[in-house]
Amino acid sequence: TSIAEQAKKTAGRRDWDEASYFDELAVRHRDYVPIARRILKWAVERGLDIWWGKGIQDPSFIPVLDFAGIRQQLFGIYLSGVFEVQFQYYKHPPFNHMEYRRELANKLNLISGVSIPEERLTKRPSFSLALLQSEDGLSHVLSTYDWFVNQLKHHATKEGADG
């Protein structure tokens, strides 16, 4: 029965890695491969951990900041061609406060076609990677998340110094 229990737990799951993710993305959304590769490169260059999803239907990769005692997911890039903002998981200062979530949403809303409404600031809103096919859109989302990471690091360092 323990084997049956384990089989139930792992049913509908798969371990993904960079190679398998990008192979499948090329099948599903070939046009999004350069976008996802650039986002991954950006995350790796900043020393972020990469968490590869386990889903079968719509797996993702998620850059994660691990710094000064905080571990924070940034966003998800899904095989369905979606960029997901992960407000629901923003538990660390300053993004545990609505004013900073609002500022992040406002920055992302400057990308043509992106519209994150106020009521989604505690959820996981998403938009199509197609909106990042322009250099302006992709550069803007990456610079916005540079700001995000810098804010997290600044607050973590400040709290460490205050503690």
What are the functions of these language-model segments?
Residues 3-130:
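Polyanion-binding interface signature
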Residues 104-162:
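Well-ordered alpha/beta subsegment
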